[in-house]
A protein has these predicted regions:
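Bacterial Sec-dependent N-terminal signal peptides
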Residues: 1-22
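Catalytic loop of the DD-peptidase/beta-lactamase superfamily, centered on the K-T-G motif
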Residues: 19-56, 142, 183-186, 192-196, ...
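Extracytoplasmic/secreted proteins, especially bacterial periplasmic and envelope-associated proteins
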Residues: 24-31, 78, 83, 87, ...
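Short active-site loop at a secondary-structure junction
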Residues: 32-42, 63-125, 162-173, 244-247, ...
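Extracellular/periplasmic catalytic domains that process cell-envelope and extracellular macromolecules
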Residues: 37, 67, 98, 113-117, ...
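Generic structural signal for alpha-helix termini and adjacent loop/cap motifs
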Residues: 60, 94, 126, 158, ...
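Active-site helix/loop module of the DD-peptidase/beta-lactamase fold
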Residues: 75-79, 93-135, 180, 185-222, ...
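Catalytic-site signature segments of enzymes, centered on catalytic residues
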Residues: 135-216, 235, 242-257
Length: 365
């Protein structure tokens, strides 16, 4: 996911919401296809355990005029990362993983690096020094990997960008290593572990690992918007098997809301572990700090006021934001890459429209 700096202002809490309070949000959702920023998009708000509003616009398949809805399956890109982070923290809670231990304690075939020791924490907070994709071929998913270990083998012998634990270098590959850790420690495949311990527990009935050889019902086609604003259907397989734990999942906007709720009500990990997960990390960073699997957006002095994650890859622009004090989650999911900046802006409109923030605060990401 490309990092972009944007200033976003939240408004004062406006009291109880009603369906017509989401007029601006609905306009934002409909604007994205109308202005050809996205082909299809859906957004939603969850409050106090209930989905109180959803809206969608555009198409999941333009040629066949199939509408994009809140239950349309599409990629979620890097929103896979907080799901994977929580899985690691579940193993931590069980005493099976030490966050300060070298990764080789759990993934013995990951090489020891001359630059320094990579710990589990370093992988979770992107300070491992592992680089992102080395080529367009890797970034666009031209090859298929049968296992996460095969995917890890592509990059495991490369030099690090920096000594581990010093600076945030956002990398999906670090989360691939965490996926291998989950498999080795749990004795289950990544997909099976996530299904049993994350998606089923959160009530996420339409979430899974994207596979190029599976024909999905109700899954959106993929579209890409180039720098000139022209949108085309993504050609080829665009295989995600080289990044599954960090960006290889599909879901619906409703499932993203359910995931956020499971985080807020501590269905997946304890309140203590949640607090640990949201601690600001002692590393250099550019823009908003990264905790363990989440960006911390608030600048009110309490970083945990608003946290979330975005996602951008071929055929996807996505954002989820959680507002714990309001027991609220907002999410937007689009089937078109190249429009993530507009998606995060629309996400803040959802928060504002629902009156889910109570300080004149500024969020930067």
């Amino acid at each position: 996911m490309k990092k972009v700096a944007v200033l976003l202002a939240f408004i004062v809490f406006g009291g109880l919401y009603a369906q017509n309070d989401f007029k601006k949000s609905e306009e934002q959702i409909k604007r994205l296809p109308h202005e050809k920023i996205a082909v299809g998009v859906a957004g939603g708000v969850l409050h106090d355990g209930k989905i109180v509003w959803t809206c969608s616009s555009g198409f999941s398949d333009v040629e066949n005029q199939i509408r994009f809805t809140p239950t349309t399956l599409t990629r979620v890109a890097s929103i896979a990362k907080p799901m994977t982070a929580i899985a690691v923290l579940q193993l931590y809670e069980q005493g099976l993983v030490d966050l300060e231990a070298p990764i080789q304690d759990y993934v013995s075939d990951f090489p020891v690096k001359e630059e320094g020791t990579i710990t589990v924490r370093h992988l979770l907070n992107h300070s491992s020094g592992i680089a992102e994709y080395a080529s367009k071929k890797e970034a666009h998913g031209a090859d298929n990997y049968a296992t996460l270990t095969e995917a890890m083998n592509v990059f495991k012998n490369r030099e690090l960008l920096e000594k581990p634990g010093i600076e945030e270098f956002y990398t999906t590959y670090g989360y691939v290593v965490l996926g291998v850790l989950i498999e080795r420690v749990s004795g289950m495949s990544y997909e099976a572990y996530m299904q049993k311990n994350i998606w089923d527990k959160a009530g996420m009935v339409n979430t899974g690992v994207e596979k190029v050889d599976v024909a999905y019902t109700n899954k959106s086609l993929l579209y890409d918007r180039n720098k000139n604003g022209k949108i085309k259907k993504v050609k080829g397989s665009s295989d995600l098997s080289n990044r599954v734990p960090g960006g290889g999942l599909y879901a619906t906007v409703e499932d993203l809301l359910r995931f956020g709720q499971a985080v807020l009500d501590h269905t997946l990990i304890s309140e203590t572990s949640t607090a640990l997960m949201l601690e600001e990390q002692a590393v250099k960073y550019d823009g908003n700090p990264y905790a363990l699997g989440w960006f911390l957006y608030s600048q009110s002095g309490e970083r945990k006021d608003v946290f979330g994650h975005g996602g951008s890859q071929k055929g996807c622009s996505a954002q989820i934001m959680l507002v714990p004090k309001r027991k609220a989650v907002v999410a937007i999911l689009s089937n078109t890459s190249g429009g993530w900046g507009d998606v995060i802006g629309a996400s803040v409109t959802l928060i504002n429209d629902a009156g889910l923030y109570d300080d004149n605060d500024v969020v930067e990401k």
